[in-house]
Amino acid sequence: MNKSWLAIIFLIISNQAMTQTSHFEPQQPLQGSGAINIVVSNLDEKEGDTYFAEAEKNERNGELNEAVTLFGKAAFEYNSSKQLARYGEALMRLSNVHYQLAHFVEAEQVVLNVALKNYSKMGSRNGQMESYSQLGRIYLALNKPTQSLWFYTQQGILAKQIGNNSAFIESVLGMANVKIRKKEYSLAAKDLNRAEVLAKSANIHEFKNQIKDARSMLPAIAAAKPAKKSSKKK
């Protein structure tokens, strides 16, 4: 496991714990401390933005190990300045880079132990939905189909609740891929047909290639679309 990543996550979790315990400690009021806190918070946020931008640049250039370090630093700075939305975004990007590096356990831990808790604390259903989607992908890569299917199902439930058609179709596709892995080809074909119908009715074209690629992994019989019933009478 990447030592720099471990150090960053330890610092983030430690900072969260210090923030929580500070509520129970009696503190003496310091004159002018409010202005100092605002300045420090703004500096932390700006540092976070700088790290985040550099991390994106490294990711685009394929320098993924550097991107891991910088997204971790950005997450730490955003957490310090209580920019929870940006904190969550940095964590999700950190997890995604780990995923690209095939560091699936690290990718899982960032989302499961940190990002998902952050989004739950915020009450962000979009953030939770994104976390479920990422965990679905990660567990499929880890060959844990039961967990993967559960998280894709949770993504679909939230997507339906908030009316996000793209995320719902993505969850159906995720479930289809899990069923392909489990060799449940008939069930997978039904999910792919459902995803295709939903995408067409919502006029969403981004999943066309994904559906095509998933169908290519099905045996010929399972991949065949159901024939339309003839309306002609004998």
Question: Whereabouts are the PLM-identified features?
Answer:
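Intrinsically disordered, low-complexity regions
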Residues: 1-234
